C-alpha cells in the first residue's frame, strides 16, 4: 500500500479506483486490481 500526501493522482491510475473514508483516514481501494491500494497520510 502506498502512503501519499495527495490521492488525486493515485485515484486516476485505474478506472476501478474508489476513494473511501475509514476511521478518519482516506483510502484508495480497487476491487479488481488490488495493487492500486493507497492511503493518505
UniProtKB/Swiss-Prot annotation:
Protein name according to UniProt: Large ribosomal subunit protein bL36
The signal peptide stretch is none
Give a GO molecular function annotation for the protein.
Answer: structural constituent of ribosome
List the source organism. Answer: Dinoroseobacter shibae (strain DSM 16493 / NCIMB 14021 / DFL 12)
Residue ranges spanning the membrane: these are none
State the UniProt keywords alphabetically. Ribonucleoprotein, Ribosomal protein
Superkingdom of origin organism: Bacteria
Q: What NCBIfam families does the database record attribute to this sequence?
A: PRK00831.1 (NF002021), rpmJ_bact (TIGR01022)
Q: Its family?
A: Belongs to the bacterial ribosomal protein bL36 family.
Q: Which GO terms describe its cellular component?
A: ribonucleoprotein complex; ribosome
Listed GO biological process terms: translation
Amino acid at each position: 500500500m502506498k502512503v501519499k500526501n495527495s490521492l488525486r493522482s493515485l485515484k486516476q491510475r485505474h478506472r476501478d479506483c474508489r476513494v473511501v473514508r475509514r476511521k478518519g483516514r482516506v483510502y484508495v481501494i480497487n476491487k479488481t486490481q488490488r495493487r492500486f491500494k493507497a492511503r493518505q497520510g
